[in-house]
């Protein structure tokens, strides 16, 4: 994914750099292959301002993440653990942080629920 000319970074590479910085600030390891797979899963929405962000203050959005991503894509059964994982990520990224990137959010959910095998 890396471009040899840093002045010509693609939008995805810029997102990747921002994501790495976000994880480093949280003291977490970055797995590029997993990140790339999640970006591919999310498709063009990662480049759309509203769709690229998660609003932890919106219960409908959090329910959609649980149903569509955790239960749908990751194949997990509905349980209190799913809601706990979502809240853990909301708090970990900062409840007052209005720019919780969906890629980071999903990446962290995959990691804490040990579902990396779905993507890599």
Where are these regions (language model features)?
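Non-catalytic accessory regions used for complex assembly or targeting
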Residues: 1-4
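Core of compact, soluble alpha-helical bundle domains
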Residues: 9-63, 68, 74, 117
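Short amphipathic alpha-helical segments and their helix-coil junctions
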Residues: 15-24, 78-97
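Residue-level detector of well-ordered alpha-helical segments, enriched
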Residues: 34, 38, 61, 81, ...
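Amphipathic alpha-helical binding modules
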Residues: 88-120
């Amino acid at each position: 994914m890396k471009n040899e000319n840093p002045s010509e970074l693609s939008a995805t590479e810029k997102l990747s750099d921002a994501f790495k910085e976000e994880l480093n600030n949280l003291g977490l390891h970055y797995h590029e292959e997993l990140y790339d797979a999640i970006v591919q899963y999310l498709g063009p929405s990662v480049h759309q301002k509203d769709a690229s962000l998660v609003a932890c203050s919106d219960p409908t959005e959090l329910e959609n993440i649980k149903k569509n991503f955790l239960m749908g894509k990751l194949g997990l059964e509905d349980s209190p653990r799913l809601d706990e994982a979502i809240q853990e990520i909301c708090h970990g990224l900062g409840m007052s942080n209005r720019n919780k990137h969906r890629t980071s959010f999903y990446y962290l959910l995959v990691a804490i629920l040990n579902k990396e095998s779905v993507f890599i």
